Regions:
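NAD(P)H dinucleotide-binding glycine-rich loop of Rossmann-like/cofactor-binding domains
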Residues: 91-171
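Rossmann-fold NAD(P)-binding glycine/threonine-rich loop
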Residues: 259-274, 286-292
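Glycine-rich beta-strand-centered segment in the early N-terminal region that forms part
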Residues: 22-36, 49-96, 130, 135-138
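Helix-to-beta-strand junctions that scaffold the AdoMet/dcAdoMet cofactor pocket
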Residues: 248-249
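N-terminal Rossmann-fold NAD(P) dinucleotide-binding loop
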Residues: 177-178
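Glycine-centered, small-residue-biased loops immediately flanking beta-strands
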Residues: 252
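C-terminal hydrophobic helical "lid"/dimerization subdomain
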Residues: 2, 286-333
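Adenosine-nucleotide cofactor-binding segment
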Residues: 164-173, 185-241
Length: 333
């Protein structure tokens, strides 16, 4: 039996839960979980905020561990390898998107949390393609959040060819934003951080922010003018998007990685007049996760993490709910 922590019903604390391991399919890998990050998406799964949860719900999709079993057709991994597993645990591996390496666009993706029991467990299984080797130079104990939060803010770098000539603005400096600062600064970009917290300035400067602007000070934001080549929003709250859009240069882009539930109201004239673009993206493909991890190893990018024992999982979750974690929570067995 595999020990796990599960929500037995929505919006309740997690309890010890045991389930039987299923036989590995030919293309699957069995991972002994050593640590697992807690993401706000896990809270959404536990609370059934999206209406897709099935109970008992074993969440967790920022897994770091060791390969302890491989299916008969597995060729990408060996027993003992240190690996990570993120939001997706499987793909069809035969559609147009998978064949192009864009597995995250596959119409038959399997979710680590919703398609099976996730990483808040002693073991988890996944399609070998979704299991990512962890390179030397990446701190294993802190790496879990890179598999979701990290790739979420790294993917636009690849998709839009962000480089050192670009001025970048980052809206929201939390679990996603603090990683975004590090990534974009490591590229050589001029980075402006937008935050509603007055107590983070020294920290944001140490992470690489060149300028810090209050995200609630409309006059200061307006005074920036149209200066950003790329403006990325990591928040899930409603803001004055026209105000922020007007800080984007002609041909620039406002990109969303935070899941704002309210409709985004923007002026079409602001888009047309400057040929500005609005876009969004979630997580990323296995190839881009690998690229991101290598980038982290080279540039010493690492999440700021608070560590908790799995036995304290409810303490960690409640602290995350209260927005008191700086900046990511990671559970270890």
């Amino acid at each position: 039996m595999i020990k796990a922590f599960a929500a037995l019903e929505a919006k309740k604390g997690l309890e010890v839960f045991e389930f039987e391991a299923q036989p590995l399919k030919p293309n699957e890998v069995q991972i002994k979980v050593e640590s697992c990050g807690i993401c706000h998406s896990d809270l959404s799964a536990i609370d059934n905020s999206w209406g897709a949860s099935k109970f008992p719900m074993v969440a967790g999709h920022e897994v770091i561990g060791k390969v302890i079993g491989i299916g008969s057709k597995v060729s990408l991994h060996k027993i003992g390898n240190r690996v990570g597993l993120g939001w997706h645990c499987g793909y069809c591996n035969s559609c147009e998107h998978c064949n192009l390496g864009d597995h995250n666009f596959c119409g038959s993706t399997k979710k680590t949390v919703f398609s099976q029991h996730g990483g808040f467990a002693e073991e988890v299984s996944a399609d070998e393609v979704s299991v990512i080797p962890i390179p030397e130079g990446v701190k294993l104990e802190d790496a879990g959040p890179l598999l979701c939060g990290g790739i979420t803010v790294f993917t636009p770098i690849v998709e839009f060819d962000i480089n050192s000539s670009h001025k970048v603005g980052i809206i929201g400096i939390g679990g996603l934003g603090h990683l975004a600062i590090q990534f974009y600064k490591a590229l050589g970009c001029h980075v402006t951080a937008f935050t509603n917290s007055n107590d983070k300035n020294d920290l944001l400067t140490s992470l690489g922010a060149d300028e810090i602007v209050s995200s609630t000070d409309s006059l200061s934001i307006k005074a920036l003018g149209a200066q950003f080549d790329f403006l990325i929003s990591t928040v899930n709250v409603k803001l004055d998007w026209n105000l922020f859009l007007n800080t984007v240069k002609p041909r620039g882009r406002l990109h969303f990685v935070g899941a704002v539930l309210d409709p985004i109201a923007v002026s079409v004239f602001s888009l047309m007049g400057g040929r500005r673009s609005i876009s969004g993206s979630p997580v990323g493909s296995p190839k881009n996760i690998t690229k991101m991890l290598n980038f982290c190893a080279e540039h010493k990018v690492s999440p700021m993490v608070e560590h908790f024992s799995f036995s304290d999982i409810n303490i960690a979750i409640n602290k995350l709910r209260a927005n008191k974690v700086r900046f990511r929570a990671v559970l270890t067995w």
